[in-house]
C-alpha cells in the first residue's frame, strides 16, 4: 500500500461566479476530474447533477436534486465516469481540475477493504487507521471519504474524532467516537446518533496534554470493549482523525494514540518529515503511508476557524442551518449544581506539596463558584452519578458527557443562572464541567 506522488498543479477551466442564467452555470466534467468551488461569505450556492455520476467526499449525488451549500463552504465534486453539473449562486472561485489524488485515496480504501476481508476470514479485527498531518491538509475530508467508501460496501467503521478544535461529531472542546452506519449526507455530514463524547474543555490539546492523552486512552478502551461484543464493529475497524499539532508534545500525542488504539495503518498527509519520524518511532508492523493533499485544500484563517466552531455549537442547539431544533431556556439554582474546571493553574514546583508534580495538577478538579464571568461559557453535563463523592476526579474525568448547555445570564442576588439547553428542565445530571469556549446566542 505505497502512495508517493508529487502533485502538479494542472488546472483547467476558468474562475466563474456561477450566476449566469436561471439554471446557473453548467460544467461538463471529464472522467476522473473534479469541480472545486468556494462559497462567498454571506452567500449560498446551489449545485445540481444534470447527467452522469458524481460524488462529494465519497457521498454520491442524486440526479436532478438541488444541494445547497452555505457561506464559506469549500466543495469538490468528483466524477469517475464524467458528468454534467449546474452551479447557481455567488462563488468565490469555481474551476475544474484534472489533478486530483482521488485514485490514490481509492487505492487506500481498497487496501483497507482487503484487510477487512482478511479479518473476516481469519476471525481477527479489522484495520485501525490514524490520519495525521499538519493543519489544513484535508485530514477530515480523507477520513470522511474512507468512511463513506467503507459504509457503502456494508461495513460499520467507527470514526474517532480527536480534533478538539474542529470536531465533526460534537461541539468543539470534545473528543468522541461515532459508529458510522450510513454514508454522510452531502450537505449535513454524518448522522450523529448516540456518539460517545468526552469533555476536554479547550480547542487546543496543548492547554492540557495529560488530559488529552488520558481521554485518548479512554476512547481506545471504549472502542476495544465495543469490538469485543460487536463483530461488525470489530471488522469495520476505525478511522482516527487527529489535530494538526505535529511537533513536540503534539507529536508525542500521535505516538500515544497509535499505541492506545493499536493502529495498523498511519496515513500521513503532505509532510515527509512527519512520515519519516513515524516510520522511525512506531513498531515495524505499523504501515506508515505518505499521501499527497488535494490541490483543492484551502488554508483557513483564525476567523474562519472561530466561525466554524460557533456554527457547530449553534447547530447543536438549533439543528442544521438553525431550522430543525428548538432549544429551551430555563433557570438553574446555584445550589442544584456542582461546577468544576479540569486542571489547576500552573504554580512553581517549589510551591507544590511534597511528592506532587505539575502533571498531577493537570487532572485535578477545581470547583468553580458561579458568578457573572460564567456568562456565555459552554458547560458539559457529565454523566457521572449525582450521588458520586463530591470532587471525585477519576469518576468525573472518565465519564462521558450526556449533553451541553450555555450560560446566557447569571443573577448572583437570586443565586440562579439562566441556561440554553437542547432539552427541557430539569438537567439530566448536576455535575457540570466548564469549557474555555464561549458562545453568544444571537437568536
From Swiss-Prot:
Recorded phenotype for the gene knockout or disruption: Lethality before 5 days post-fertilization (dpf). Mutants display abnormal swimming behavior, abnormal head shape and curved tail. Defects are due to neuromotor defects and cerebellar neurodegeneration.
Compartment annotation: Nucleus
Expression across tissues: Strong neural expression.
Protein residues bound to ATP: 34, 74
Biased composition (Low complexity): 13-24
Role noted for this protein: Polynucleotide kinase that can phosphorylate the 5'-hydroxyl groups of double-stranded RNA (dsRNA), single-stranded RNA (ssRNA), double stranded DNA (dsDNA) and double-stranded DNA:RNA hybrids. dsRNA is phosphorylated more efficiently than dsDNA, and the RNA component of a DNA:RNA hybrid is phosphorylated more efficiently than the DNA component. Plays a role in both tRNA splicing and mRNA 3'-end formation.
Subunit field text: Component of the tRNA splicing endonuclease complex. Component of pre-mRNA cleavage complex II (CF-II).
Similarity comment: family membership: Belongs to the Clp1 family. Clp1 subfamily.
UniProt protein name: Polyribonucleotide 5'-hydroxyl-kinase Clp1
Lineage of source species: Eukaryota, Metazoa, Chordata, Craniata, Vertebrata
